[in-house]
């Protein structure tokens, strides 16, 4: 085992903020060895403060400042910040509650007919399963592309999408932590004339993102995992041309050009997917979290995650490691005899991981704000499983 006190050099950033400094800003990380960022990334104090202060200012200042003007100015400011982070233009971004919310908004914008085909993989989170399962009631066929070890077979995928209307898959699998070839899968779907929707929730804050490079019609994500933002700060990218062909079923005064017009005329771009009077407080917090990640540097974050993840995998026997031995992301699936019992046992020692429904395993999420000492502690605690 490597020296627990030696930290990966990749945590350093030229602008002066380090991953260690970011960690010190997150109160929850002083309570345990936390390895569940793939589900929830605890926020720095200033992220929570920004969201709380926005609510206070919006509510307490409404006697002197129009609350709608304030909210709409904030919608646009946070939209611009999110767009810059993911490589989009502001009008291509809708503010949502979550990835699940974004996927549902897209699913509800099609005029589905019996016989239409939706394709997904067998590794999708329920966010990428349940909206399509509901459509089966309307006669929509849902095809599931089987994977092996977190990998997708290109030929099987191409066959499945040949006559599909929509394809939904994850950029990073939440089970194995594998990175799917997004651009290639999008191109195959495009050639078949299918709409492509990418679940990218495991990407922001862990890897650099450029949705234009991916070429997908839509990308749903959120900032409450690797970005360390608050719950409720979701976002949905929709290509301009793709958006023009979609008519969301959920519609309100924020969706349309003129709420009092005789006919519904949706706003251009992704704004048509926004509905009513939601607080942008969570997204205000998210912008603070994005600033923190960028202060460290996304390349430095990714490099440090790689160093710490490799350290973890070095302590896991080959027959127990379900994720690729070679690094892809900080999500690591480990085979244990009783995942739920293992999660509880580790929690009793103040080590936080989670169980997976499929494969039957525990999942460890290693972040740049994790430490080498924590990784070594986890490996030691897992040794009784082998």
Question: Language-model segments: what does each one mean?
Answer:
Residues 1-386:
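Pyridoxal 5′-phosphate
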């Amino acid at each position: 085992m490597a020296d627990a006190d030696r930290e990966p050099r990749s945590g350093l950033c030229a602008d002066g903020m380090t991953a260690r400094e970011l960690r010190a800003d997150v109160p929850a990380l002083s309570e345990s060895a936390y390895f569940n960022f793939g589900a929830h990334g605890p926020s720095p104090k200033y992220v929570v403060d920004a969201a709380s202060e926005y609510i206070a200012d919006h509510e307490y200042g409404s006697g002197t400042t129009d609350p709608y003007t304030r909210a709409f100015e904030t919608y646009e400011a946070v939209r611009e910040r999110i767009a810059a982070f993911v490589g989009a233009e502001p009008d291509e971004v809708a503010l949502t509650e979550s990835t699940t919310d974004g996927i549902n908004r897209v699913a509800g914008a099609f005029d589905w007919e019996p016989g239409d085909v939706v394709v997904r993989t067998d590794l999708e989170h329920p966010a990428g399963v349940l909206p399509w399962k509901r459509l089966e009631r309307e006669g929509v066929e849902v095809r599931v592309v089987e994977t092996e070890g977190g990998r997708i077979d290109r030929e099987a995928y191409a066959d499945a999408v040949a006559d599909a209307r929509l394809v939904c898959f994850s950029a990073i699998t939440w089970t194995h932590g594998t990175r799917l070839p997004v651009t290639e899968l999008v191109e195959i779907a495009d050639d078949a004339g299918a709409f492509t929707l990418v679940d990218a929730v495991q990407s922001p804050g862990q890897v650099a993102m450029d949705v234009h490079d991916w070429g997908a019609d839509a990308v749903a994500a959120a900032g409450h995992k690797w970005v360390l933002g608050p719950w409720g700060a979701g976002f949905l990218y929709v290509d301009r041309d793709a958006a023009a062909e979609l008519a969301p079923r959920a519609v309100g005064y924020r969706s349309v050009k003129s709420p009092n017009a005789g006919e519904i005329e949706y706003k251009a771009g992704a704004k048509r997917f926004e509905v009513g009077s939601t607080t942008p407080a969570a997204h205000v917090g998210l912008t603070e979290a994005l600033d923190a990640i960028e202060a460290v540097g996304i390349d430095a974050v990714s490099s440090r995650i790689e160093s710490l993840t490799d350290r973890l995998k070095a302590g896991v026997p080959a027959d127990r490691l379900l994720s690729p031995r070679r690094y892809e992301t900080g999500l690591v699936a480990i085979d244990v005899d009783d995942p739920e019992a293992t999660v509880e046992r580790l929690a009793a020692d103040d080590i936080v991981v989670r169980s997976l429904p499929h494969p039957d395993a525990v999942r460890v999420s290693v972040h740049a704000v994790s430490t080498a000492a924590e990784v070594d502690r986890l490996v030691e605690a897992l040794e009784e499983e082998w």
